[in-house]
């Protein structure tokens, strides 16, 4: 597997574009991904019960068959809690995209992100779709068009050889606040020119989302609009992938690399964040327990503020373990921060405070927890909680 300098349109047969339609003051705010041939597709959605209109429209597109040729996305407006008119507007976005690209209606997915409750300005949406280019657009413009409070574009591309053919996979995501997925707002789109059955793609997506996107948190809020969509158009012309083969294992490894990179990028770009926090839990009896405990630690406001302040307060970590709901032995926990052991058998060790303080000034903080009761592990990612987070969200609508 090779990391390449690419974009969401790097896999064969894919194109992307983005434009400024006026939903936001300056940045691009509408874009699409287009495949020149129908692509096998898979998707997962927010677990928030107040799902936005685009979620329902995309689910409808998947009803007839698991194939897509395009994804239309707008930012600046979530089209959530907008009633029947919001649903009609999302359907209109799908219809206009299908008409312009000359593809079937049910081969278009729709995604939106932004302020909840405002009606879509359909005059701007319509004009924006008309501006988008089918095959001569700029993929970087799409990557900008999906952003809201994000401070940087989140993109990654890999290549590997499968069945004697070069296969490419690219991913792009947005997310900075309202991130606590349970597949926030989190949108992620993955393209690949690999040939893989839709059913196997859906199964793999669910596994990787549980290991990556569902293990990140910024502020504990789960969005109405979370969506991850994968398109595999087969243009690499590799033999159709089959589960249990060496080629499928290579593809799955590449998929893991893409989703993990995007997930960590979202966590690192949390609103007002200055540090990425990574929590690794080992020695659990079940993977689910390890993941649960890791996510509870990284979700703790007290752990997050301690990371912001450079305070190695292990009491906040042990407290989060205690209410996590995961299984552990209270008297047999080891905690390390940056490889420095600060707790052994649930008792504080003698450690180098100066070295710990210096480590906590770094931008990537790794907390290791060993439960010593099993062989399973899990990882979660988040960010610190700063003054800037409050400032951004206190003034979000203005």
UniProtKB/Swiss-Prot annotation:
The enzyme's E.C. designation: 2.3.1.35, 2.3.1.1
Positions contributing to substrate binding: 148, 174, 185, 271, 393, 398
Family matches, as SUPFAM superfamilies: DmpA/ArgJ-like
Keyword Glycosyltransferase belongs to the record: no
Organism annotation: Listeria monocytogenes serovar 1/2a (strain ATCC BAA-679 / EGD-e)
Name of the featured protein: Arginine biosynthesis bifunctional protein ArgJ
Major site of localization recorded for this protein: cytoplasm
Subunit structure: Heterotetramer of two alpha and two beta chains.
Family: Belongs to the ArgJ family.
Pathway as given in its UniProt record: Amino-acid biosynthesis; L-arginine biosynthesis; L-ornithine and N-acetyl-L-glutamate from L-glutamate and N(2)-acetyl-L-ornithine (cyclic): step 1/1; Amino-acid biosynthesis; L-arginine biosynthesis; N(2)-acetyl-L-ornithine from L-glutamate: step 1/4
Reactions accelerated catalytically: N(2)-acetyl-L-ornithine + L-glutamate = N-acetyl-L-glutamate + L-ornithine; L-glutamate + acetyl-CoA = N-acetyl-L-glutamate + CoA + H(+)
InterPro entries xrefs: Arg_biosynth_ArgJ (IPR002813), ArgJ-like_dom_sf (IPR016117), ArgJ_beta_C (IPR042195)
UniProt keyword annotations, A-Z: Acyltransferase, Amino-acid biosynthesis, Arginine biosynthesis, Autocatalytic cleavage, Cytoplasm, Multifunctional enzyme, Transferase
Pfam families, sorted: ArgJ
Function: Catalyzes two activities which are involved in the cyclic version of arginine biosynthesis: the synthesis of N-acetylglutamate from glutamate and acetyl-CoA as the acetyl donor, and of ornithine by transacetylation between N(2)-acetylornithine and glutamate.
């Amino acid at each position: 597997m090779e990391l390449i300098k690419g974009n969401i349109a790097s896999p064969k047969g894919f194109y992307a574009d983005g434009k400024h339609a006026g939903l936001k003051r300056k940045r691009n705010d509408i874009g699409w991904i287009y495949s020149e041939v129908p692509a096998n597709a898979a998707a997962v959605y927010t677990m928030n019960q107040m799902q936005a209109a685009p979620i329902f429209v995309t689910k409808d597109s998947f009803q007839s068959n698991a194939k897509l040729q395009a994804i239309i996305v707008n930012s600046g407006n979530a089209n959530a809690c907008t009633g029947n008119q919001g649903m009609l507007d999302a359907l209109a976005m799908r219809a206009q995209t299908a008409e312009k690209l000359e593809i079937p209606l049910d081969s278009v997915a729709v995604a939106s992100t932004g302020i909840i409750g405002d009606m879509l300005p359909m005059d701007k949406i319509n004009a924006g779709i008309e501006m988008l280019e089918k095959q001569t657009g700029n993929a970087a413009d799409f990557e900008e068009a999906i952003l809201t409070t994000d401070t940087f574009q989140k993109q990654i591309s890999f290549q590997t050889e499968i069945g004697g053919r070069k296969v490419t996979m690219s991913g792009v995501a947005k997310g900075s606040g309202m991130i606590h997925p349970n597949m926030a707002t989190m949108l992620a789109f993955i393209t690949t020119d690999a040939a893989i059955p839709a059913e196997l793609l859906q199964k793999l997506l669910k596994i990787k989302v549980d290991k990556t996107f569902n293990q990140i948190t910024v502020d504990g809020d789960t969005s109405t609009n979370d969506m991850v969509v994968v398109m595999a158009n087969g243009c690499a012309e590799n033999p159709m992938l089959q589960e249990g083969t060496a080629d499928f294992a290579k593809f799955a490894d590449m998929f893991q690399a893409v989703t993990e990179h995007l997930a960590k990028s979202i966590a690192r770009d949390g609103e007002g964040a200055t540090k990425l926090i990574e929590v690794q839990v080992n020695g659990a009896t079940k993977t689910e327990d390890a993941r649960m405990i890791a996510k509870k630690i990284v979700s703790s406001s007290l752990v997050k503020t301690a990371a912001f302040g450079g305070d190695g307060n292990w009491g906040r970590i042990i407290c989060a373990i205690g209410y996590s709901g995961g299984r552990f032995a209270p008297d047999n926990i080891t905690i390390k921060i940056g490889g420095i052991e600060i707790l052994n058998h649930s008792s504080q060790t003698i450690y180098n405070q100066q070295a710990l303080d210096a480590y906590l000034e770094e931008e990537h903080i790794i907390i290791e927890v060993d439960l010593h009761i099993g062989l399973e592990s899990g990882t979660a990612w988040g960010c610190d909680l700063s003054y800037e987070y409050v400032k951004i969200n206190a003034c979000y609508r203005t």
